[in-house]
Amino acid sequence: MTVPQPPEPIPGARLLFSLDPSVSHLNHGSFGAVPIAVQRAQQRLRDEMEANPLRFFTQGLVDRIAHARRHLAAFLGADPDGTALVGNVTAGAAVVLQSLALRPGDEVLTTDHGYGAVALSIARECARTGAVSRTLPVPLTATDEELVEIVRTGLRPGRTRLLIVDQLTSPTARLFPTAALVAVAREQGVPVLVDAAHAPGMLPATVASIGADFWVGNLHKWAYAPRGTAALVVTPQWREKIQPLVVSWEQDSGFPTRVEWQATLDYTGWLAAPVGLFTLRSLGVDRVRAHNAALAAYGQRVVGDALGVAPERLPKPGGPAVSMRLVPLPPGVATTLDAARELRARIADRLSAEVSVAGWNGRGYLRLCGQVYNTPDEYDRLAVRLPTLLAQR
């Protein structure tokens, strides 16, 4: 079996991070990794805050947040006046859901590739308002055309108040044809929220090119920002309807400031986020994207080969730029949340490798990521040792 050639490592890239060198960190997609330069920038801001907290919070902080927001919005291809910084995609989705004023009979439509925490937020809002949540099953092997048709026929104009779709799915590492899905929903008058948790830094598509009513993406994954940094982008017709989860002193300032200002929080991560973009650009954005996608594809093939998965049975990512890939586990392995957590912990403890393990629709999957600090030999070692560990279950 021919395995694709791995990409050439980016010289010195691993030294930019403070990761434990005794561990193979193959799950960048879950919590990211903050470059040392970004950590230091944030610490300088924290030192400033602690030297004079009153001055830090009361003299110019709102303007400094807006300045950082403009940098991040420009990188995303988004309107800075329509962009609010939030803690993460889950928080941004909650902001949108609670701002819709759902009523009994309304529905929120999603697919079964959605992120679990967002699904929990939908369930809570529906329970509070009397609306209902409906999930469309989408086969892992569905083509883009089939996916669009599934959503088209699933929409119920007049009842569907919101369609939530992923730009790149978390549990299945599948790139969705987001712009086409948004267009289909718009034809039927249904607003769309795009969960773009993994898009910033990984995918080249701009927010404007997608055209969704609401778009929310994490910058603390593939754009090297401190954790707790995400952007919620809202089209003009919705901005005055969007309300913060916590009302505070900037409530009368309108969107986006009233969403951003959540009382006394540590805002230094947002202020340091542009340093993450500088780090990414210094490495070369296109170079990093190509490297990470090629490395993830290599890891998928070598680990899949070790587990006896034929190349044609490896899940397709839906696009060339995807830096996360799935490997099916043997039948019966990690099919439940508890079993997946247990296997992930065993792999971490016994193989010194951090990976994502998830059960989806009755099948367990390993999700592997590629990042500039990874090297091909890390996937090779996992491929050699994983079959023995699985045989010991």
Language-model features: locations:
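Structural signature of PLP-dependent enzymes
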Residues: 56-58, 257-301
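Conserved N-terminal alpha-helix of the aminotransferase class I/II PLP-enzyme fold
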Residues: 52-91, 292, 306
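Glycine-rich phosphate-binding segment of PLP-dependent enzymes
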Residues: 20-22, 30-62
